[in-house]
Every structure is written in structure tokens, then in C-alpha cells.
């Protein structure tokens, strides 16, 4: 059994209900949102409308919708930022690095000059904060670990609008 992170209320459900300005794109089964932690400028997450925690919990229709949404935002990120690459990833359970108990699929434009290394940029922050990889998430370390990637609401809104304007028709 995979151990799940606990957050109540669910921050991704709150985005869907109360912070609609963070939504870049939407479909029947998904929302694409700007990640509040900009490890790379333009980092987005595709989330399910239905509150489920794991890839293992998704329906086949939701799985297909997630990849379609990820491709749409990846195309918009490519147009908007001309990145060197686009990283996609998803974590299942706290021991894989999942911090929010709501399915989300990261879509990250990798920029020239990035010093996060290869792979998910969040993992690089674990080492610098003294958190060994593969350990349970402790929200108490978020402030130190995420200090470098915090963006203001204005910056997030502007970035979201730039990406939104480049979504495929």
C-alpha cells in the first residue's frame, strides 16, 4: 500500500474552487494550472477535476485526458519560452516525493542556465535542505526548501496569461 501525503484542505481542490486565475486550460476531466512553486519559469501541473491521489486511481478516460492536456500545455510552453527541453513527471506516494494528495502531472520547461540538474527540479531541493531523497515529506521544511522558487501572485498571473495565450487552438 502506498503511503499518501496528508493535506487538509486539498490545495489543488482549492485552486479549482477558489483560485481560478491560476487555471491555464481545462477539459471535462482535467485542469492545467500554474505551479505556485516556479522551479523553472512556466512550470505547470495537469490535475484531475475528480479528487484522486494516485495514478493507480485514475480511469482510462482520465489517463488519456491527462496526456492530451499535458501535450497542449507543452506546446504552449515551447512557443512561450523556447526551452531546451520539457520535463514531465508524476509522483505516487510520499516515498516517491508526492507532497499533495491529489493527482498532478508536472510539465516543466527546462531553461538555459538552469542549475537544477537532470530530472525533477524538486528533487534537487531535497539535498540542499538536508532532506534525503525517498523520505517522507515534512511540511516544516517547505519554507527553506522553496524559498528560492516562490513567485508572487502577480508574477504567476502574468506567466499563466503568457502560456494561456499560446495554447493550441
Regions found by a protein language model. Name each.
Residues 1-169:
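HIT superfamily nucleotide-processing domains
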